[in-house]
């Protein structure tokens, strides 16, 4: 079976089909797959046609493809294609194996006229003739023409038999003035010979799928991004290691900060007298190192300052440098951590090198736990490198440098337990100094220090503020003074009064006042009785701390508060004092029950009950203050106690709380008149001091006039 390559012109693009000549029929294009391909690739998918028009074209195309030897079927298809698809008529007419008749010739002639293919017209007329008669030929050299015409097989000779009528019709249709076309080879004949030799190659353009185009674009963008990332990374590493970054930005942010003229002295640091005494030895060592080394002794070179935040560790280090009058190099622990491996160790070396050049000097690293945490196998390499370099420099310079020009290393941290043992061992940090929270005398000294440049009113008693700020650090006290000064300035006052200081303290302890909170008169009265119960029990209970202030002004989540102040800071408490503490705590709930009855008590006492339960539990399980339990510590073993022992512990806690509640209720019943007066005064004024509460309890009726004046 022979195969012939047929060019099919479909809408300006050339496609090629192989058609086989079967030994049973000799019919061309008899494969149903080829027919379907012709239909779907040609007219049916043409854009801009009505769907019904497309279906009609597809129908006639199927009929024409199924009857390739029937010229009438071809003519019907040409008729449908004549208006919109002249290229398709020309392409199909010039295809070998397609039957023709006079009607097909007319449609072909009309299609050529529309496309103005005059050369193709004359050549294809000669191609359709069955014999080369000189009488009917319009060319002067038939041999030259026949040389360019491809030979047909015997199967196609029967399909091209009606060419004289085509020649006659073409000659009659041409106008008289039209000259005879020259014998030029038609494009169709050249096209039919495409692919037959190397001189006439077939150019095939493969249309890529849309997914392939997108994937190629994505690969290009991804490759460009990766390449750009590595280029920028290399440039940043080069700029960091070569110092170009600092030159371009003109910054020394990560360089050791050196201060020579430090004005801080030990007199500026208050409330930490013990820490100052230990650091004074370091100052004397920096001033005269030979005085301590003449007998072979060595003073510590590394000092670790520990303690809660805000206690003055940084100020102590600056005071050491200021007293010794030596250069002071400061860096934070977080400044050693960078994204590049090795930068932290490099900065440690630079810090110690700069300090040695200026010796005697002081190196201070704040928040030392940022680089000195305990090491483990899971740590990143750069973290271990920074700590290792710090360990080497700490142990190295103390042995090799000149004793006449020492370098003292001071570190500060709030979490000494997190530091690596190799860092805190003797030889690196020889001395550990704890900087605690100040006691009442220390707080008073700090308040006096921070109010040196603040004008105070005549009514200000800083000792009362110091007694009421237990647990405040130096930074908290400085903030208290600053807020009071700002509040007084806002109120156009000429000096800071005691009321301004109390407002600032209450704001820090309890939060801002909620003056806009809507409270019904009933709830306000109940809150006044609740706070009055606390204050009254504190006034009439032996060993209880005296009430300092009572208020029903909402602050934070609290609707009111009664504050008691100790005379001094206490580290231990007696059993009587703990029982008095329980009675005062239960006074608020007892006052509610006394006024409204047991069924009208509220949930406002939940915080009081929680505190009282904690005190009673510690009395039983930690302090050995229970007669039935005895002097036994059970807090650490509560989970391992037997059910009977645990029940006994809970029973003792409950007994202490119930006894305290009954004592408070009995006291308030005996002082019901004073309770009513105290609650009424709180409703009227919302705030009572200790002196005002004493006057109300004694029946002073001039309180309103004195308070308003």
Curated annotation (Swiss-Prot):
Entry keyword Cell cycle: no
Instruction: State its Enzyme Commission number(s).
Output: 3.4.24.-
Composition bias type Low complexity, residue spans: 153-165
Q: Which UniProt keywords apply?
A: ATP-binding, Hydrolase, Membrane, Metal-binding, Metalloprotease, Mitochondrion, Nucleotide-binding, Protease, Transmembrane, Transmembrane helix, Zinc
Q: Which GO terms describe its cellular component?
A: i-AAA complex; mitochondrial inner membrane; mitochondrion
Give me the segments passing through the membrane. Answer: 217-239
Residues reported in the UniProt entry to bind ATP: 307-314
Q: Which cofactors?
A: Zn(2+)
Q: Which residues form the active site?
A: 531
Enzyme superclass (EC): hydrolase
> One Pfam family of this protein, by short name?
Peptidase_M41
**Out of the domains of life, which is the source?**
Eukaryota
* Membrane disposition: Single-pass membrane protein
Q: Which InterPro entries match?
A: AAA+_ATPase, AAA_lid_3, ATPase_AAA_core, FtsH, P-loop_NTPase, Peptidase_M41, Peptidase_M41-like, Yme1-like_N
Q: Tell me, which GO biological process terms does this entry list?
A: mitochondrial protein quality control; mitochondrion organization; protein quality control for misfolded or incompletely synthesized proteins
UniProt region (Disordered), positions on chain: 152-182
Q: Which PANTHER family match?
A: ATP-DEPENDENT ZINC METALLOPROTEASE YME1L1 (PTHR23076:SF97), METALLOPROTEASE M41 FTSH (PTHR23076)
Membership in a protein family: In the N-terminal section; belongs to the AAA ATPase family. In the C-terminal section; belongs to the peptidase M41 family.
What is the protein name stated in its UniProt record?
ATP-dependent zinc metalloprotease YME1 homolog
**Native species:** Schizosaccharomyces pombe (strain 972 / ATCC 24843)
């Amino acid at each position: 079976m022979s195969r012939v390559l047929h060019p099919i012109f479909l809408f300006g693009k050339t496609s090629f089909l192989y058609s086989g000549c079967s030994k049973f029929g000799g019919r061309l294009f008899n494969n149903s797959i080829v027919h379907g391909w012709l239909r779907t690739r040609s007219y049916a998918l043409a854009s801009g046609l009505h769907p019904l028009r497309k279906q009609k074209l597809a129908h006639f195309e199927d009929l024409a493809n199924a009857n390739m030897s029937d010229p009438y079927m071809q003519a019907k298809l040409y008729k449908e294609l004549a208006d919109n698809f002249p290229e398709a008529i020309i392409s199909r007419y010039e295809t070998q194996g397609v039957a023709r008749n006079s009607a097909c010739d007319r449609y072909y002639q009309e299609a050529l006229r529309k496309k103005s293919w005059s050369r193709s017209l004359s050549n294809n007329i000669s191609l359709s003739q069955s014999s080369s008669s000189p009488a009917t030929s319009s060319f002067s050299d038939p041999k030259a023409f026949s040389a360019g015409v491809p030979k047909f097989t015997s199967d196609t000779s029967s399909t091209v038999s009606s060419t004289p009528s085509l020649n006659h019709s073409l000659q009659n249709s041409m106008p008289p003035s039209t000259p005879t076309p020259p014998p030029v080879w038609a494009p169709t004949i050249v096209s039919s010979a495409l692919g037959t030799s190397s001189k006439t190659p077939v150019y095939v353009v493969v249309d890529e799928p849309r997914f392939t185009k997108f994937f190629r674009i994505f690969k290009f963008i991804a490759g460009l991004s990766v390449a750009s990332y590595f280029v920028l990374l290399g440039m940043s590493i080069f700029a960091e290691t070569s110092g170009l970054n600092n030159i371009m930005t003109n910054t020394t942010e990560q360089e050791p900060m050196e201060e020579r003229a430090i004005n801080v002295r030990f007199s500026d640091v208050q409330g930490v007298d013990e820490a100052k005494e230990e650091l004074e030895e370091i100052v004397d060592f920096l001033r005269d190192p030979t005085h301590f080394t003449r007998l072979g002794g060595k003073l510590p070179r590394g000092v670790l300052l520990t303690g809660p935040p805000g206690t003055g560790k940084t100020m102590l280090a600056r005071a050491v440098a200021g007293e010794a009058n030596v250069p002071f190099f400061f860096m934070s622990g977080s400044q050693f951590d960078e994204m590049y491996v090795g930068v932290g160790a490099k900065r440690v070396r630079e810090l110690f090198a700069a300090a040695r050049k200026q010796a005697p000097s002081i190196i201070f690293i704040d928040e030392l736990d940022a680089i000195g945490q305990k090491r483990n196998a899971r740590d990143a390499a750069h973290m271990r490198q920074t700590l290792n370099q710090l360990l080497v420099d700490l142990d190295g310079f103390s042995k090799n440098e000149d004793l006449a020009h020492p370098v003292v290393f001071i570190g500060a941290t709030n979490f000494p337990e997190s530091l690596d043992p190799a860092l805190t061992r003797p030889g690196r940090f020889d001395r550990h100094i704890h900087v605690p929270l100040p006691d009442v005398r220390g707080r008073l000294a700090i308040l006096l220090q921070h109010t040196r440049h603040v004008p105070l009113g005549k009514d200000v008693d800083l000792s009362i503020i110091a007694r009421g700020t237990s647990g405040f650090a130096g930074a908290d006290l400085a903030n208290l003074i600053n807020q009071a000064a700002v509040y007084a300035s806002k109120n156009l006052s000429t000096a800071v009064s005691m009321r301004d200081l109390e407002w600032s303290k209450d704001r820090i302890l309890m939060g801002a006042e909620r003056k806009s909170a809507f409270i019904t008169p009933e709830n306000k009265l109940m809150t006044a009785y609740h706070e009055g119960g606390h204050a009254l029990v504190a006034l009439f209970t032996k060993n209880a701390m005296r009430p300092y202030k009572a208020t029903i002004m909402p602050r934070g989540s609290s609707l009111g508060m009664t504050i008691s102040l100790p005379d001094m800071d206490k580290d231990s408490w007696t059993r009587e004092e703990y029982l008095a503490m329980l009675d005062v705590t239960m006074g608020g709930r007892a006052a509610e029950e006394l006024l409204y009855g047991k069924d009208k008590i509220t949930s406002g006492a939940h915080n009081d009950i929680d505190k009282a339960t904690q005190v009673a539990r510690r009395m039983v399980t930690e302090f050995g203050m229970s007669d039935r339990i005895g002097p036994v510590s059970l807090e650490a073993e509560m989970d391992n106690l037997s059910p009977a022992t645990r029940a006994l512990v809970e029973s003792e806690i409950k007994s202490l709380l119930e006894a305290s509640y009954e004592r408070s209720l009995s006291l308030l019943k005996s002082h019901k008149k004073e309770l009513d007066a105290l609650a009424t005064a709180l409703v009227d004024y919302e705030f009572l001091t200790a002196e005002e509460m004493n006057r109300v309890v004694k029946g002073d009726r001039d309180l309103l006039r004195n308070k308003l004046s």
